[in-house]
């Protein structure tokens, strides 16, 4: 059965913390080293040490690599990863993380992705961190990744470009690109690094899932702090009754808006989805004095109601929000990864009362493949569905 993992980022996330947490949750260090050797690059090693910090026992992962100013482009890193013998899903996840990092760096520096030269994240230890997380998830059988809101910290951090405010511009750009939820935190250190942010932006949905818990892992960061500088992961199996539990106890929030620009309303819908809303949609309506407007609706679980109402009040011009409890019928669904000659794409399958009745490729995966290889989007959809029908699933 494909597994589910939840990154509980109560003290942020970095690449080495993520590696340590996966190892602490049961990932074999020997198996991870063997997977990373498929990168065909020399000069690194990976150690893992059990530590006790305050009330917590966990694992500190440390990548040993030569220090130095290595400037690699995205194409350089793609070449290292794509020419490896790693599984297709690991290559795909790693590429996705580095692409998000490159896009954020390009945005911050006002240039294009092809002109970006990675500094810290181009170093060998950072490559091992990122590919190691992707390989670790694959070895653990994880197909669905979830994450908590992220604390960022405060103050200043040193970088190859000189001192930068915390959170770093790259970290903020990455989190903004996916509407990731953040939490206020004035700890005077960098809690969420660009690498950690990119891992979650590329792979995670920002909500807590229903799951049957199998293991817990704590990954320690290098810095010693008054509070535990740790990342916690929850590893488990999907709850077979998750969908049934969602049929009851849902809240439908609605508000009418006729005095706000469309792009701001679109942003509000993105923020609601990132916060964990089950569904968000807009309906055109005609309001008083014949003014066109929209009805913004959000379907949320009861425990998310207060958060969603606050977001609606803060992100829109509304003066009030209606609420009502609702029930819904839902199909069982799962996601499989389909390996194609052009890359891996996820497909969502739906079942009704045990019978498979439909499947749909994930648009973002297919669009990325189409852009990278210069082929029509419809052709990618057709290729993915053809591979699915022929049984070319990864799971």
UniProtKB/Swiss-Prot annotation:
S-S bridge residues: none
Q: What keywords are assigned to this protein?
A: Nickel
According to the UniProt entry, its GO molecular function terms are: lyase activity; nickel cation binding
Q: Which Pfam family is an annotated match for this chain, by its short name?
A: Ni_insertion
Asked whether the UniProt record includes Lyase among its keywords, one would answer: no
Name the family the entry cites: Belongs to the LarC family.
NCBIfam families on file: nickel pincer cofactor biosynthesis protein LarC
Name under which the protein is recorded: Putative nickel insertion protein
């Amino acid at each position: 059965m494909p597994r589910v993992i939840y990154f509980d980022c109560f003290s942020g996330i970095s690449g080495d913390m993520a590696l340590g947490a996966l190892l602490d949750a049961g990932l074999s260090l020997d198996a991870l080293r063997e997977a990373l050797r498929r990168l065909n690059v020399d000069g690194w090693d990976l150690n893992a040490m059990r530590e006790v910090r305050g009330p917590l026992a966990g694992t500190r992962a440390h990548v040993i690599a030569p220090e130095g100013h290595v400037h690699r482009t995205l194409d350089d890193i793609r070449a290292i990863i794509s020419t490896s013998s790693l599984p297709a899903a690991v290559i795909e996840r790693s590429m996705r993380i580095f692409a998000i990092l490159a896009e954020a760096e390009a945005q911050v520096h006002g240039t294009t992705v092809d002109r970006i030269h990675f500094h810290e994240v181009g170093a060998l230890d950072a490559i091992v961190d990122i590919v190691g997380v992707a390989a670790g998830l694959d070895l653990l059988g994880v197909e669905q990744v979830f994450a908590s809101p992220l604390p960022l910290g405060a103050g200043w951090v040193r970088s190859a470009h000189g001192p930068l405010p915390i959170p770093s511009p790259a970290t903020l750009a990455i989190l903004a690109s996916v509407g990731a939820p953040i939490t206020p935190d004035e700890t005077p250190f960098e809690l969420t690094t660009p690498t950690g942010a990119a891992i979650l932006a590329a792979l995670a949905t920002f909500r807590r899932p229903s799951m049957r818990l199998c293991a817990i892992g704590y990954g320690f960061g290098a810095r010693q702090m008054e509070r535990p500088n740790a990342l916690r992961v929850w590893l488990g199996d999907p709850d077979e009754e998750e969908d049934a539990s969602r049929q009851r106890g849902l809240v439908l929030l609605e508000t009418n808006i006729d005095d706000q620009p469309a792009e701001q309303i679109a942003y509000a819908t993105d923020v609601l989805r990132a916060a964990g809303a089950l569904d968000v949609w807009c309906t055109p309506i005609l309001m008083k004095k014949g003014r066109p407007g929209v009805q913004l609706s959000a379907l949320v679980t009861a425990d998310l109601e207060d958060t969603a109402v606050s977001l609606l009040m803060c992100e829109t011009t509304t003066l009030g929000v209606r609420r009502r409890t609702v029930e819904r019928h839902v199909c069982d669904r799962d996601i499989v990864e389909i390996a194609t000659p052009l890359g891996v794409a996820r497909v969502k399958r739906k079942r009704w009362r045990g019978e498979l009745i439909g499947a749909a490729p994930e648009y973002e995966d297919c669009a990325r493949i189409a852009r990278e290889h210069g082929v029509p989007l419809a052709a990618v959809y057709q290729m993915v569905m053809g591979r699915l029908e022929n049984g070319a699933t990864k799971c």
